[in-house]
Curated annotation (Swiss-Prot):
Region annotated Disordered, chain positions: 71-121, 150-224
Subcellular location: Secreted, Cell wall
Gene: chpA
Keywords carried by this UniProt record: Amyloid, Cell adhesion, Cell wall, Peptidoglycan-anchor, Repeat, Secreted, Signal
Induction field: Transcription is coordinated with that of the antibiotic undecylprodigiosin (Red) locus. Transcribed during aerial hyphae formation on minimal medium, about 10- to 25-fold lower expression than the short chaplins. Weak expression in aerial hyphae (at protein level). Expressed during aerial hyphae formation and early sporulation on rich medium, under control of ECF sigma factor BldN.
Biological-process GO terms, alphabetical: cell adhesion
Major localization class: secreted
Signal peptide: 1-20
Source organism per UniProt: Streptomyces coelicolor (strain ATCC BAA-471 / A3(2) / M145)
Motif LPXTG sorting signal: chain residues: 217-221
Propeptide: 219-252, 221-252
Protein known as: Chaplin-A
UniProt keyword annotation of Cell cycle present: no
């Protein structure tokens, strides 16, 4: 009996109430397994220019000049409205932000259960190489390299809000007039009949309001601890009464 009372008391002490509050938990899901759900992205943008170079062993009058190498991205500039009398294509104004062109990678891994699964490796490589205006001579004379040009241009699509200019249209000649658009006339109703009334909008009854449950406190589980504590108190009181009666009977 004493052991039962002690056990119930210990259980009631261990059952501390839980606090109810809003919380958020985040976890990586849908990729159970070892070494799974990995993503590796290595975008590389390496412009290489080699132009206007000379490699000579025995040569004379072998210059290299006036060569040009470029790796550029065309950027849109802010447009301005045209003046009076200009076309519609030149009078539209737009403002776009220039963005650099290059290699990029977008990827994700999801829903890959297993070992070593769900891996995503993306290696976009953008390597523009310019090789122009170069000479390699062993025995040469008067072998110049000049006036060459290498370019790698990346044009941007029209930005948001920009529209392509309309195709040119030929105006009518002198003295000619544009034909009027065709008109569609509805035939009149026959004699003796009345025109049908226009359809009236149907009256829609609003839906009945949905009853929402009132807010209530969360159940923290403290009711069980109160019952265990009450049972422990009853057992202790009964044990004390039985102990005193046993002492009284043994003394007679």
């Amino acid at each position: 009996m004493v052991a039962a009372a002690a056990a119930t008391g210990i259980l009631s002490l261990c059952g501390s109430p839980a606090l109810a509050d809003s919380h958020a938990d985040g976890a990586a899901t849908n990729s159970p397994g070892a070494v799974s759900g990995n993503a590796l992205q290595v975008p590389v943008d390496v412009p290489v220019n080699a132009c206007g170079n000379t490699v000579d062993v025995i040569a004379a009058l072998n210059p290299a000049f006036g060569n040009e190498c470029e790796n550029a991205s065309d950027e849109k500039t802010d447009g301005h409205g045209g003046g009076y009398g200009e076309d519609a294509s030149s009078s539209s104004s737009s403002s776009t932000s220039a963005s650099s062109s290059g290699s990029h990678a977008d990827g994700a891994t999801e829903g890959s259960p297993g070992v070593g699964s769900g891996n995503n490796a993306q290696v976009p490589v953008d390597v523009p190489v310019n090789l122009c205006g170069n000479t390699v001579d062993v025995i040469a004379a008067l072998n110049p390299v000049f006036g060459n040009k290498c370019e790698n241009d990346a044009e941007e699509p029209p930005g948001y809000g920009e529209e392509e200019p309309p195709p040119p249209t030929t105006p009518p000649g002198y003295g000619e007039e544009e034909p009027p658009p065709p008109t569609h006339e509805e035939p009149p109703p026959p004699s003796g009949e009345e025109e049908p009334p226009p359809p009236s909008e149907e009256e829609h009854t609003p839906p009945a309001p949905q009853t929402e449950q009132p807010p209530a406190l969360a159940e923290t589980g403290s009711e069980g601890t109160l019952g265990a504590a009450a049972a422990g108190a009853v057992l202790i009181a009964g044990g004390a009464i039985l102990y005193r009666r046993g002492r009284a009977l043994s003394g007679r």
